[in-house]
Curated annotation (Swiss-Prot):
Annotated stretches, region: Disordered: 101-126
Residue spans of biased composition, Basic and acidic residues class: 104-126
Keywords, in A-Z order: Ribonucleoprotein, Ribosomal protein, RNA-binding, rRNA-binding
UniProt-listed Gene3D superfamilies: 3.30.70.60
A family per Pfam: Ribosomal_S6
Name of the protein: Small ribosomal subunit protein bS6
Classification via InterPro entries: Ribosomal_bS6, Ribosomal_bS6_sf, Ribosomal_S6_plastid/chlpt, Transl_elong_EF1B/ribsomal_bS6
Family annotation (SUPFAM superfamilies): Ribosomal protein S6 (SSF54995)
Organism from which the protein derives: Aliivibrio fischeri (strain ATCC 700601 / ES114)
Gene Ontology CC annotation, any one: cytosolic small ribosomal subunit
Length: 126
């Protein structure tokens, strides 16, 4: 089996259905004997350039280990799903399991907010 990194962008009006799409795509990979090494839902983000007069999209990143036939099936599913604006499937040399730069930055921001909240409460109490 080979390792792949998959990124796809979903129409912002279909953001509620992203969880179902992820479940469907990961289910097809695991049913065929593949494994999901990393799954990150980056949420709605600004795109670098407009696509179909849209400026935002819902981003999802997956690192998987699977057979080529499953990846071909997944690519066909992306092609015929109107909600998927763009997708990219890249073959990688090894499984990538650590959080991406996007998720690390998100975790750092949330940690800073958690640190700032007790300080604000202490300042208000004084």
């Amino acid at each position: 089996m080979r390792h792949y990194e998959i990124v796809f962008m979903v129409h912002p009006d279909q953001s509620e259905q992203v969880a179902g799409m992820i479940e469907r795509y990961t289910g097809s990979i695991t049913e065929a004997g593949g494994t999901i090494h990393r799954l990150e839902d980056w949420g709605r983000r600004q795109m670098a350039y407009p696509i179909n007069k849209l400026h935002k999209a819902h981003y999802v990143l997956m690192n998987v280990e699977s057979e080529q036939a499953v990846i071909d099936e997944l690519e066909t599913a992306f092609r015929y799903n109107d909600a998927v604006l763009r997708n990219m499937i890249m073959r990688t040399k090894a499984a990538i399991t650590e959080p991406s730069v996007m998720m690390k930055a998100k975790e750092e921001r949330s940690a800073k907010r958690e640190d700032a909240a007790p300080r604000a409460e202490e300042a208000a109490a004084e």
